[in-house]
A protein has these predicted regions:
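Extended Gly/Ser/Thr-rich low-complexity repeat segments
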Residues: 1-2, 48-62, 98-109
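Helix-rich interaction surfaces within compact, conserved domain-sized segments
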Residues: 67-109
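Hydrophobic beta-strand residues in large extracellular and virion-surface proteins
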Residues: 12, 27-29, 39, 81, ...
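Beta-rich globular "head" domains
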Residues: 16-71
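Glycine-rich, low-complexity segments
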Residues: 1-22, 106-108
Length: 109
């Protein structure tokens, strides 16, 4: 496989009341061979309190430092996420439980 071919997409194990929004695709993650992690899909209905865990990435997908990323909320605005070296993907701000989309979230590990 070349570096541009990502690993197979894996479904995220959602936590704190979040569920996959099947109309817009399950929340999933993948990684290229050169270490870029991609997230995609949409979830709904979960806890929106700051620092609430949405899901946890497996060890080989985790950043070495804390990252702050933007996802898309129900108002088509920026929802702020934290992605920790522990693998926890957490709510930071402007997250709406109606739905939360990860299609534009990526980072290098």
């Amino acid at each position: 496989k070349s570096e541009s071919n990502p690993t197979a997409w894996q479904n995220a194990n959602l936590q704190n009341g979040w569920s996959h929004h099947r109309d817009y695709g399950n929340v999933q993650f993948s990684k290229t061979f050169d270490g870029i992690v991609y997230l995609k899909g949409t979830c709904k209905g979960g806890k929106t309190t700051r620092e609430s865990i949405i899901f946890t990435l497996p060890e080989s997908f985790r950043p070495s430092t804390t990252l702050f990323k933007t996802a898309l909320n129900n108002d088509y605005g920026s929802a702020v996420l934290g992605i920790y070296p522990s693998g926890n993907v957490v709510v930071k701000g402007n997250v709406d439980a109606t739905w939360l989309n990860f299609d534009n979230v990526s980072f290098k590990i």
